[in-house]
Regions:
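A short N-terminal beta-strand-loop micro-motif at the entrance of redox/enzyme domains
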Residues: 9-15
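Mobile "lid/hinge" segments at catalytic clefts and subdomain interfaces of large enzymes
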Residues: 162, 195, 385-389
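Eukaryote-biased recognition of intrinsically disordered, low-complexity regulatory segments
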Residues: 1-9
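Aromatic-flanked redox-active Cys/Sec active sites in thiol-based oxidoreductases
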Residues: 8, 36, 141-142, 185, ...
């Protein structure tokens, strides 16, 4: 243990602990902008500087470890002056039109500036302006970039895609698509991790709420919405709702108040996907098609984009099943339209999805022209849903639990677990078990595949009616790349893989 003093608090912490971690252990928060634990600990923003007694210069707390006998000041006059000056300099290169920014109220830079009582920027504004095709599902605004490098590190270390890179030096430093490529040709999987970890509004998904409003304004248009299983676990946070309050039934109420005509649960089409994937797996397994290479799930459009760009020779190993989103879109404009005696051309199919890649999936030619245009007409992410509710002046606390519309309400429960890693695999295996044996498996028969282990993927072996089935579940594109390489080198062998 190392004995130190932080802001007059004497504590002992393990060797190797950073100053920031030591301060956090006694509930002393240190402002930070670029820090991302274990991923981006480069001290680039210098907002987290602290003063160490006996040293003339300030040090970054995120990447400097404690030493025996250190006396540290996290908010001394010298630290406050330096920190405020640093943030003022950052703001001089930042388009601070917060009122029109999607991250207003949820922006790290905005929070830090407010906490430091910065009410004016004394330096001349020098804002970087770069062109970007805002029709693309992923939108980058260079004028809001603070060069924190989070997007680069997340894309490199977690996803292994290397889409973003830094160029220039000093004040001319900028972040952009690596190798000066256009984002549309850069093999981006549209996983959205760079958006999630961006501390400002420099990265965001394309906002499609206006498309929905235009449909709602058309009296001849029937707006039909579906809500993905994963959304119910993530929505409402920015609206101040607790996990217990943010039920999926309240989303139904919100959408109806906004003017949506019918609201369905994508769990229904997740069941359709599972039946197709389970049936396809049994058929391919029985035919010996999986003896060398596995069948891969096809629900995640980010993963589908990844395999098409990185491992095109393995595309034929994907399940032929559409994603639940696209299956529901097809159902809406065929079975639902027929049942309700509605012209499919009048149906506007809306999807509430957790992922920006779903916007790209909707636009694929594969899902166009089968009936009334695209199967899905508009995709809103969870963040857009929250903004939509605020824009309609709906008080989240007044939302009530409302039931989904019929007839596509009933589900087996298999679709609900799609929102968890391993959920698709577990549901597919349960279906395969029933298709092979004619019996339902035990409730926890496949529970060991839930989650991902420290090696990046979970593997398991099951016996079904005398057949040995090897499966794997992986999350994260870098982990997926490692798994794909191992499969191609014959280091591992699986019959079925969920990504």
């Amino acid at each position: 243990m190392v004995n130190i003093t932080i802001d007059n608090h004497t504590i002992a912490v393990p060797s190797g602990t950073t100053i920031m971690e030591a301060a956090a252990s006694i509930h002393i928060p240190i402002p930070k902008l670029c820090y991302l634990k274990d991923i981006n600990e480069i001290g680039a923003c210098r907002v987290c500087v602290v003063e160490i007694e006996g040293q003339d210069h300030l040090v970054t707390s995120c990447n400097n470890v404690v030493e025996e006998g250190m006396t540290i000041y996290t908010n001394s006059p010298k630290v406050r002056r330096n920190r405020k000056h640093t943030v003022e300099m950052i703001l001089s290169q930042h388009d601070a039109q917060c009122a029109t920014c999607v991250r207003s109220g949820n922006c790290t830079l905005q929070t830090v500036a407010n906490d430091l009582n910065i009410v004016d920027s004394p330096y001349k504004k020098e804002i970087c302006i770069e062109e970007w095709d805002t029709r693309y599902p992923l939108v980058r605004d260079a004028s809001k970039c603070v060069k924190c490098m989070r997007c680069i590190q997340v894309c490199d270390k977690i996803q292994g895609m290397h889409i973003w890179d830094v160029s220039g030096t000093g004040a001319r430093t900028t972040v952009g698509v690596s190798e000066n490529r256009d984002i549309k040709t850069a093999d981006c999987a549209l996983c959205g991790q760079c958006i999630t970890h961006c501390p400002t509004g420099a990265l965001r998904e394309r906002d499609d709420t206006d498309k929905l409003y235009r449909a709602l304004e058309d009296k001849d248009t029937i707006v039909v919405a579906q809500i993905a299983p994963a959304v119910r676990a993530a929505w409402g946070e920015s609206l101040g709702l607790s996990r217990e309050e943010a039920t999926v039934e309240k989303i139904v109420d919100a959408l109806r108040r906004i003017g949506v005509d019918y609201v369905f649960d994508t769990t229904f089409s997740a069941d359709l996907t599972i039946m197709e994937e389970g049936t396809e797996f049994v058929e391919r397994f029985t035919n010996g098609d999986l003896d060398m290479y596995p069948m891969f799930t096809s629900c995640c459009p980010g993963w589908v984009r990844f395999i098409k760009s990185q491992y095109p020779q393995m595309v034929n190993r994907l399940s032929s099943a559409k994603s639940p989103q696209e299956m529901f879109g097809a159902v809406m404009k065929t079975a639902f339209a027929k049942k309700m005696n509605i012209d499919p051309d009048r149906i506007f199919a809306l999807s509430i999805m957790p992922c920006v890649a779903k916007k790209d999936e909707r636009e694929k030619p594969l899902f166009h022209g089968e009936f009334a245009g695209h199967g899905v007409d508009c995709v809103l992410t969870t963040r857009e849903l929250d903004r939509l509710i605020r824009a309609d002046h709906i008080d989240p606390k007044t939302l009530k639990d409302a039931a989904f519309d019929t007839p596509f309400t009933e589900g087996t429960g298999a679709g609900v677990i799609f929102g968890a890693t391993g959920g698709v695999m577990e549901a597919a295996l349960r279906s395969a078990y029933y298709l092979i044996t004619g019996k339902n498996p035990e409730v926890d028969a496949f529970k060991q595949i839930r989650g991902v282990n420290k090696n990046g993927w979970t593997e398991a072996q099951f016996e079904i009616a005398g057949n040995t089935i090897n499966i794997a579940v992986v999350s994260g594109l870098q982990n997926t790349r490692n798994l794909m390489e191992a499969i191609q080198k014959r280091e591992v062998h699986y019959h079925f893989v969920e990504v």
